[in-house]
């Protein structure tokens, strides 16, 4: 099969002949079951992971019966699978992410309303790297408030209880400090009365 050329657009919008199928013998042997258009597509773009119709390919071209071509199957390498992405991270990671989000929202509210009594200046916006103590963490400026202010911040009860449930701490009876402010008689309304 002779080398085919077709007009192609160059960068300036003009046309120039482009040579395709530089090795027609190899293309016709390795992809003997493909039509001329398919050979061009394989010669131009060869992605072993996904076939042209969106289905997963095995890395070796398949014949019409679905079996790999004998010529190219010995030279094809199987595609490597990327490590699976964990959609369900560990509970402690979810809890720390939730606390970080709340912390940044709380600092954002404090910065938006600096005129409140007891707040001399807006709190610094600490990034995730600073909380993790990474090497590239930024230290607060000399005039910034001390990090001890976080200890006096009120915690939203809904958020705290959602974290308790998420971590499974609601099933632990030996943590009475989590139930501060709740009376033991509050729980009697939850139980059905004997009738």
UniProtKB/Swiss-Prot annotation:
Localization of this protein: Nucleus; Cytoplasm
Keywords: Activator, Apoptosis, Cytoplasm, Developmental protein, Differentiation, Nucleus, Phosphoprotein, Transcription, Transcription regulation
Gene3D superfamilies in alphabetical order: 6.10.140.2200
GO molecular function annotation: chromatin binding; protein homodimerization activity; transcription coactivator activity
Principal location class: nucleus
PTM annotation: Phosphorylated. Phosphorylation changes in a cell cycle-dependent manner and reduces its transcriptional cofactor activity.
Record GO biological process: apoptotic process; branching involved in ureteric bud morphogenesis; melanocyte differentiation; negative regulation of DNA-templated transcription; negative regulation of neuron apoptotic process; nucleocytoplasmic transport; positive regulation of DNA-templated transcription; response to transforming growth factor beta
Biased composition (Low complexity): 54-78, 137-148
Residue stretches of biased makeup (Polar residues): 97-106
Motif (Nuclear export signal): 160-169
Region (Disordered), start-end ranges: 1-24, 51-149
A single cellular component GO annotation: cytoplasm
Disulfide bonds: none
Taxonomy, superkingdom: Eukaryota
Free-text function comment from the UniProt entry: Transcriptional coactivator of the p300/CBP-mediated transcription complex. Enhances SMAD-mediated transcription by strengthening the functional link between the DNA-binding SMAD transcription factors and the p300/CBP transcription coactivator complex. Stimulates estrogen-dependent transactivation activity mediated by estrogen receptors signaling; stabilizes the interaction of estrogen receptor ESR1 and histone acetyltransferase EP300. Positively regulates TGF-beta signaling through its association with the SMAD/p300/CBP-mediated transcriptional coactivator complex.
Subunit text: Interacts (via C-terminus) with CREBBP. Interacts with EGR2. Homodimer. Binds to RBM14. Interacts (via N-terminus) with HSPA8; the interaction suppresses the association of CITED1 with p300/CBP and SMAD-mediated transcription transactivation. Interacts (via C-terminus) with TOX3 (via HGM box); the interaction increases estrogen-response element (ERE)-dependent transcription and protection against cell death. Interacts with ESR1; the interaction occurs in a estrogen-dependent manner. Interacts (unphosphorylated form preferentially and via C-terminus) with EP300.
UniProt record similarity statement: Belongs to the CITED family.
Protein name: Cbp/p300-interacting transactivator 1
Organism whose genome encodes this protein: Bos taurus (Bovine)
